């Protein structure tokens, strides 16, 4: 098998510069993915009414809950491929590629079937408002039909990121993003398809991005080449992906579960609050993706350096990623805080909806950097091969805390503000425990390296 290129080497050179160059296209890609959702929300809110806006928005937490397990497996593929790449294990990289793509297709089909047939029942469990549940069900069913393509893109983009390539997935999303916006306008304004048109535009554009990124892997030479004729599961690669990815997916699912519970509580305030919350959440997503690019950089850089046994780089990776995520989080969060009212008017002209969205942004935006710190510390742990620890910490620090909060504090002080404040509290507590765990793991790995050096002497 042809030798791997060193173009994606993340183990040497100026680390901060490499992290920024890696993260910028990744952040841009995430922004484009958010523009898919923003285009949905803006077009629907402007041209189909607040009921349609609430129908689309009420699906967000549920969709995340159902897909995050497989997104976690995509992260597992990223960690395993990056570690093999850092160790210059060509065979390991190739087997990871073949296995990851196969898992994405199997998982995507599974999610499509489950999501399509369970859509209405799941929305009922979430107490979706009666005036929007039929529209929400229609949107959700169409969305899940495209799930195989969504999963295929996520896995393939993760594989490319593992070897330092964040630019070409950006191009794929840029093309798909233009298609999504055009189709949104055509389906909703011209053909009056409302939420069905929005969902259809989304899955068609995601199909384009999935096909494009798959072609990139097929055209790769050497270890990263995707051989579509020999797709299959390699046991060792699958077990490693599951070992890292399953806990990561469960962690994301835990967060989504708590968000579903909070969304259910928000639904109880009616469609106006649901619509405002949807618009604000969409705006906050832009802050999150700006930070999350550095969290994803942390896991890829850490994984490659662990594979190359360059433990001396791990502290630099952690410090630089934490610095970047804090600066970006504060800058974007404060910008959204002060410009919230203007930004929300892009989503709706209904002043009651804008006011409802503003009440959320005023609480969450300035503290959002805590979420970035939490994710970056968890990524550093996963990159070092410890994925169960952040899962357990998140289970207790986020899901359990938020559930207890809703069952106690929210019952005593029933308001949207009481719900929203649970987010920054859980971020701060979870980040603190992640940091303690990371320091313990860091000491363990350094002691192990010293022992190996002593034995080799």
Task: Say what each PLM segment does.
Residues 1-23, 81-146, 179, 190-246, ...:
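Short alpha-helical transmembrane segments in multi-pass integral membrane proteins
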Residues 12, 16-35, 39, 62-69, ...:
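Residue-level signal for short hydrophobic patches within transmembrane helices
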Residues 17, 32-33, 70-71, 111, ...:
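Alpha-helical transmembrane segments of multi-pass membrane transport proteins
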Residues 21-40, 142, 176, 205-209, ...:
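Transmembrane helical elements of multi-pass membrane transporters/channels
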Residues 31, 35-54, 123-130, 186-193, ...:
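Helix-terminus/linker motif at the lipid-water interface of multi-pass membrane proteins
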Residues 38-41, 113, 121, 155-159, ...:
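Alpha-helical transmembrane segments of multipass membrane proteins
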Residues 53-113, 150-169, 263, 276-340, ...:
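Small-residue-rich hydrophobic transmembrane alpha-helices
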Residues 74, 142-161, 169-177, 198-213, ...:
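Short runs within selected transmembrane alpha-helices of multi-pass transporters and secretion channels
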């Amino acid at each position: 098998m042809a030798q791997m290129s060193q173009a994606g080497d993340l183990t040497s050179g100026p680390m901060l510069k490499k992290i920024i160059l890696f993260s910028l296209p990744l952040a841009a890609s995430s922004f484009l993915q958010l523009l898919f959702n923003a285009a949905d929300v803006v077009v629907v809110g402007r041209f189909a009414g607040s009921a349609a806006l609430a129908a689309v928005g009420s699906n967000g937490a549920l969709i995340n809950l159902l897909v995050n397990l497989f997104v976690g497996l995509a992260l597992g593929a990223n960690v395993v491929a990056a570690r093999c790449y850092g160790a210059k294990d060509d065979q390991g990289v190739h087997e990871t590629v073949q296995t990851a793509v196969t898992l994405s297709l199997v998982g995507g089909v599974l999610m499509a079937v489950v999501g399509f047939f369970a859509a209405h029942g799941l929305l009922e469990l979430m107490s979706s408002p009666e005036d929007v549940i039929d529209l929400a069900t229609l949107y959700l069913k169409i969305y899940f039909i495209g799930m195989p393509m969504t999963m295929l893109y996520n896995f393939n983009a993760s594989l490319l990121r593992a070897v330092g390539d964040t630019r070409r997935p950006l191009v794929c999303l840029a093309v798909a993003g233009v298609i999504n916006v055009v189709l949104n306008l055509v389906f909703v304004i011209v053909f009056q398809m409302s939420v069905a048109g929005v969902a259809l535009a989304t899955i068609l554009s995601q199909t384009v991005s999935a096909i494009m990124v798959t072609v990139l892997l097929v055209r790769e030479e050497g270890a990263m080449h995707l051989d579509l004729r020999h797709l299959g599961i390699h046991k060792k690669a699958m077990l490693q992906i599951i070992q890292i990815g399953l806990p990561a997916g469960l962690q994301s699912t835990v967060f989504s579960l708590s968000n579903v519970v909070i969304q259910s509580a928000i639904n109880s305030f009616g469609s106006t609050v649901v619509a405002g919350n949807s618009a604000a959440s969409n705006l906050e997503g832009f802050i999150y993706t700006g930070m999350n690019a550095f969290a994803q950089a942390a896991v890829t850089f850490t994984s490659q350096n662990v594979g190359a046994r360059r433990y001396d780089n791990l502290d630099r990776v952690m410090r630089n990623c934490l610095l970047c995520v804090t600066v970006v989080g504060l800058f974007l969060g404060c910008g959204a805080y002060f410009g919230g009212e203007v930004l929300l008017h892009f989503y709706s002209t209904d002043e009651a909806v804008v006011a409802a969205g503003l009440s959320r942004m005023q609480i969450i935006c300035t503290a959002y950097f805590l979420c970035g710190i939490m994710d970056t510390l968890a990524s550093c742990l996963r990159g070092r091969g410890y994925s169960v620890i952040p899962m357990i910490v998140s289970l207790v620090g986020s899901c359990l805390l938020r559930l207890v909060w809703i069952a106690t504090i929210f019952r005593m002080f029933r308001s949207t503000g009481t719900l929203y404040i649970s987010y920054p509290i859980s971020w701060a507590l979870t980040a603190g425990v992640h940091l303690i765990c990371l320091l313990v793991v860091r000491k363990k790995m350094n002691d192990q390296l010293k022992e190996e050096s002593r034995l080799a002497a």
